[in-house]
Amino acid sequence: MKVMSSVFLASILTIGSAFANVTVAKEISPAKSVDNIQMNSQQELVDLFFAAAKIGNSEVINEFLKHGFPVDVRNKDGYTPLMMATYYGHQAIVSSLLKHGADRCARDNRGNTALMGALFKMEFAIAKQLRQVDCDAQAQKTGQKTTAEFAKVIGQEKQLQKLIQEQEKAQAKTQK
């Protein structure tokens, strides 16, 4: 069953791209360019990747990543799949994306990070995972909100402080 599932997912990637080209090919007028057709099929793949991150479909996410799909691809709002998986509470997807090099410090069009999304949605286990890298140094340079400022605005500053203290204790134990 697992082999069949993997074959099915791989075929989605291949057929999805081909289907998009065939579907658009029917509507080609002399004014339409090959670049537009290719952009449409690429956008469909991006949409599928984001949908998988949103609903927590780790099989689709892992299949895309296995075939070299860009882990930090963005949608029109500047969200990354990491932000989407975080916001919807899919810790397994978050772990997989991080393992494949997802940028924890990426900011959306409003200047928010995945960690901010985790705090907003009270996904503290995911927040703990994301907080392993401090992304605030760059925020201070660019005039964007730091995680602490964001946490204060949404009333989660105590949770953030607790998270930071837990991580500091864990680091102190490992250094001994």
Language model feature labels by segment:
Residues F64, L97, L130, L163-I164:
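Conserved hydrophobic site in ankyrin repeats
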